[in-house]
Amino acid sequence: MKTIKIALFHYHFLPGGITTVAINAVNSIIKYASLNSFKIEEIVFISGKEENLENIIQKQIEKPEDSETIIKYDVDNSLDYLADNYKYDEHDIEEKIILLFKKYEGFIWWIHNYQLGKNPVLTRVITDHLQKNNNQKAILQIHDFPECARPENYRFLAEKKYTIYPIINNIRYAAINARDERYLKEAGVPDKMVWLLYDPVSGLSKKQLIENSKIKNSNAKSLATKSDATADLHKKKSSKEKLIEQFRKTFPALNPENDFGLYPVRTIRRKNILEAALLSKITGNGFNLIVTLPGISAQEKTYSDIVKECFEKGYIPGIWGCGSNIYGEPVPLDNVINASDFVISSSIMEGFGYHMIDSLLWSKPLITKYLDIQEGFSDIFRNTASFFYDFITVPVEKKNREKITQLYFDSIRRYSKIMGAHNIELALQQIDSILTRDSVDFSYLPVYLQIEILAKVSDDKAYRKDVKTLNNNITEKILKVIKTKQHYDPLKIADYFSFRSFAAKFFKILNSFDNDLTLANLPETDNSTNVSDNEIVSRNLLNLFFRPEFLRLLLSER
């Protein structure tokens, strides 16, 4: 039995994606530590912000009764995001981080998104410290890359010559999807340093799923199922009526007669909300789009406010922000799920994509844009009520296409200091080929034009007919899928995403520090003598992500 302590680092633990992952991950490893021959003495959540930490410790960490693991938190503002609009004392921040690290010597470090460029000082201090202290073991878990659609973040790290991905034997890189795992290896990180660690999903106890499957076909279960179905219909009707009553005066295009398509996300640019809105207007007689949360960061608030205004003006049928307190008491997510007929996503960039897994667990049909992060677990959607579409096209006048092309050229040339001329020219040619056609992939349009198209679809019958005709194959499939009962294989999902599966992989990573002779014999590296080797991984990642789908104007930081 190995005894360990874990220090879990992130910029913040505010409600959201990475926080959910961290909570589920901690619950996983506490529950299954002994099964994997580990004893966890202590886990510390270490953050740049105190907000929400007490709530996590008191209410969201689920310790088994026999667990002796101590759970606590520590806060130091040196870990927080560094704002771009003021001068900060880099030396002062560095000293604080080093003092913090000294407190947690002897712990396994589990650091999330350390390299994102949101706090470049933290990135540098982490990688320097790990290179100089080869007894300090660290799992560096990557959810997002600065090399992917974040040129300002990446440029700052690159210009400062910061090491981003050191190749040293006391580090393991954890990727949350198969594409990212593949990219890290292709970029030059040794295979045995890179591990695929899918985000854990709660509610996937294999034992309980097996028990449920055993009684599924019994007579008692059959009778109970009919009773449950009636109760579910009543609950759905009641939840839908409450939502309509609460929001019909705020959102004039909300249509009580149409289906509810749930998009359970924050309103941020990469979620490409307005494409889902377009689908809500051209699919059959239309459906209500339900978007749960606003965007909150400075970079996303403008986009969030624009989408909010589109709902309020009636450009988009449905409800926006029902999970926030903007319009009064927030509606619990369970109530919104109960009211919904299917789950929809038009996201153009995801790390994991919880909504896809959740749609199955909620027994809701799924309509989603295809993303390459799905390549590792696409088999769980086989024979389910799920439809993956590639793109939605709309007619765009030549003068607008020429204007958009220039916007792309200006945006892509921002990479000129960090990308070679050949790569820049190739990207420009690819974008030009996308925009020379009379009909254009909606997700490549700037936000202002997306809004104009939504308004035109509402007001111009001829244009609406053209858009419907262009996308008829897709909308016909959507109409079929959303009326299909959701079926899935729960045991297959559990194999990928259960707490037990996550814990087994996590502890296997920890064992690899001691068990892998190949890695144990890796030469020690030093930041000052091996700069070129350290830079090549990041440079290769930049090339892998330098593709039109990651250069969309929607992802632009300006």
Stretches found by the model and what they are:
Residues 386-558:
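C-terminal amphipathic helix plus adjacent low-complexity
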Residues 1-59, 130-136, 500-507, 511, ...:
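N-terminal subdomain of nucleotide-sugar transferases
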Residues 88, 97-122, 137-141:
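Short N-terminal targeting/anchoring amphipathic segment
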Residues 348:
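Aromatic "clamp/platform" in nucleotide-sugar-dependent glycosyltransferases that forms part
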Residues 155-193, 201-208, 512:
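A short, active-site helix/loop in glycosyltransferases that binds the activated sugar's phosphate group
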Residues 303-336, 381-393:
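Nucleotide-activated donor-binding/catalytic signature segment of Leloir-type glycosyltransferases, i.e.
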Residues 7, 211-216, 221, 232, ...:
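Conserved donor-binding/catalytic core segment of Leloir-type glycosyltransferases
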Residues 14-15, 31-89, 97, 116, ...:
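N-terminal strand-loop element at the rim of the active site
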